[in-house]
Amino acid sequence: MDDGYASVMPANAYNWTAVWRRNYLAWRKVALASLLGNLADPITNLFGLGFGLGLIVGRVEGTSYIAFLAAGMVAISAMTSATFETLYAAFARMDVKRTWEGILFTQLTLGDIVLGELVWAASKSVLAGTAIGIVAATLGYASWTSVLCAIPTIALTGLVFASLAMVVISLAPTYDYFVFYQSLVLTPMVFLCGAVFPTSQMPDSFQHFAGLLPLAHSVDLIRPVMLERGADNAALHVGALCVYAVLPFFASIALFRRRLLR
């Protein structure tokens, strides 16, 4: 690793907390509006698809469709919350408000900033995903214990999609480019990864492809927990999510370094 790259890596194990705290203090002023905005879409989908389509579909994989869907919506909510926090809020702090430039005049490195942004986005995903789980538990489609047990996977899902989105904002010149990521990456994952309907209904080639996507690993961990079943290949899914979180993190640091040096 060259000295230039090493100099932008996280300086230590705790500097990132300053970035997290800064974002939390700013978010606290608009917390209610932020939470409602993050929850409106997944809750609408949960009730609309769950009760509407559920009457037609009936039972799926041994459970009611709305219980099946609720677990998928927890994963989707974690994905979208972390993604949009990174795409829009982190991009604004980096490119529009130039907050990152000001922070770099302190003892924090670029790696500290990126790590703090990732953990902050994951924190918001925990709030969003857990809130959907609470709705499901309140309606009797999940147990309170299962929702608590799903929180670590929700947090890891948030880290994964924040890390992937961080690569996107390191390359995107403006907000306009985010629509390509949303349309070509996020939306297909929602429908291919088993969140809305079982992947067993798809052709084998699609199943193999979907199994490589990060949301599929998240769904395959969250759904068994919320339905109080054993998760198959849990270690494989956790390992895959860790790879999806770590590799884009290091890639984004290198890309941000090149961008800021222009």
Curated annotation (Swiss-Prot):
One example GO MF annotation: ABC-type transporter activity
Residue ranges crossing the lipid bilayer per the database entry: 37-57, 64-84, 102-122, 125-145, 149-169, 177-197, 236-256
Signal peptide location: none
Keywords: Cell inner membrane, Cell membrane, Membrane, Nodulation, Transmembrane, Transmembrane helix, Transport
Topology in membrane: Multi-pass membrane protein
Keyword Repeat among record annotations: no
Residue ranges of every copy of the ABC transmembrane type-2 domain listed in the record: 33-259
Compartments, as annotated in UniProt: Cell inner membrane
Assembly and oligomerization: The complex is composed of two ATP-binding proteins (NodI) and two transmembrane proteins (NodJ).
Family annotation (NCBIfam families): nodJ
Descriptive protein name: Nodulation protein J
Organism: Bradyrhizobium diazoefficiens (strain JCM 10833 / BCRC 13528 / IAM 13628 / NBRC 14792 / USDA 110)
Source species taxonomy: Bacteria, Pseudomonadati, Pseudomonadota, Alphaproteobacteria, Hyphomicrobiales
